[in-house]
A protein has these predicted regions:
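Aromatic "clamp/platform" in nucleotide-sugar-dependent glycosyltransferases that forms part
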Residues: 136
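Short hydrophobic beta-strand element within catalytic cores of glycosyltransferases
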Residues: 149, 153-156
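A conserved mid-protein helix/loop that constitutes part of the nucleotide-sugar donor-binding site
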Residues: 54, 58, 63-77, 98
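Nucleotide-activated donor-binding/catalytic signature segment of Leloir-type glycosyltransferases, i.e.
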Residues: 97-119
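Conserved acidic donor-binding segment of nucleotide-sugar-dependent glycosyltransferases
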Residues: 171-179, 187-193
Length: 239
């Protein structure tokens, strides 16, 4: 980092951190997404009994900083017949996985799918009622971009990394506040019209805001700047 000519960061929060901590100017070039093909619920119905809009989805690594414990605690007190689908691998944190299963054992609406990929992953994103990311800590949450690109209504914690992505196009709760998360989940389950309104604008918003053309353009600009600097150094050294 000390000797880097240029630094690229994925979020404005990290950009501010580098500025305040190291006095370094950085280039903010976020992750991006393409609009995916939506898929009907076939594989997930056969394997898990899931149908369109029948579940709330979390998808990511099962680690403490993702806030999954809050999500399970909050969901257990939500009055709904929808399921909570927690999809993802334990990422070498088997003890945390066991803790989550112990916490969820009395609620048969909570489903742990394990690691998911391919067509089944597409189906989970395509048919969720809402997608939730209750994280305490994030960089640039690619799963959130992906969820919105599928046209999902998203419920996220109010950490800067999530808030700067969704702006006013998603539902937001107070980080680590189980009661507030429960109320937001309940409200979403009770008001499908509001959920639908968020769904209708999610994909267009996120694919326009985070598109690959801009990423390529900005990255090439950084590369061009580096090449120009290198050429000037070579000329001065007469190499």
């Amino acid at each position: 980092m000390k000797y880097a000519d240029e630094i690229i960061v994925l979020s404005k929060g990290v950009q501010e951190y580098f500025k305040e901590t190291y006095g370094r100017k950085t280039h903010f070039i976020p992750n991006s997404v393409n609009r995916p093909q939506l898929r009907e619920a076939n594989l997930i119905t056969d394997k898990f009994g899931l149908k369109k809009d029948s579940y709330i989805l979390f998808l990511g690594r099962l680690v403490p900083e993702k806030g999954i414990r809050y999500l399970v605690e909050a969901f257990k007190n939500v009055k709904t017949d929808k399921k909570l689908v927690i999809a993802g691998g334990s990422s070498d944190t088997d003890s945390f996985m066991e803790e989550l299963k112990e916490l969820a054992k009395d609620d048969d609406r909570i489903l742990f799918t394990g690691f998911i990929q391919g067509t089944m992953l597409d189906e989970l994103y395509s048919n969720a009622y809402i997608y939730t990311l209750p994280s305490d800590l994030e960089g640039m949450p690619l799963s959130l971009l992906e969820a919105m690109s599928y046209g999902n209504c998203c419920l996220v914690s109010d950490i800067p990394e999530c808030a700067e992505v969704v702006e006013d196009k998603a539902l937001i709760f107070k980080k680590a506040d189980v009661q507030d998360l429960q109320e937001k989940l309940q409200d979403a389950c009770d008001h499908p019209d509001e959920v639908d309104a968020h769904k209708k604008q999610a994909a267009d918003f996120i694919c326009k805001k985070y598109n690959w053309n801009e990423v390529v353009k900005e990255t090439m600009l950084v590369s061009w700047t580096l090449n120009k600097m290198s050429s000037e150094v070579i000329k001065k050294l007469k190499i």
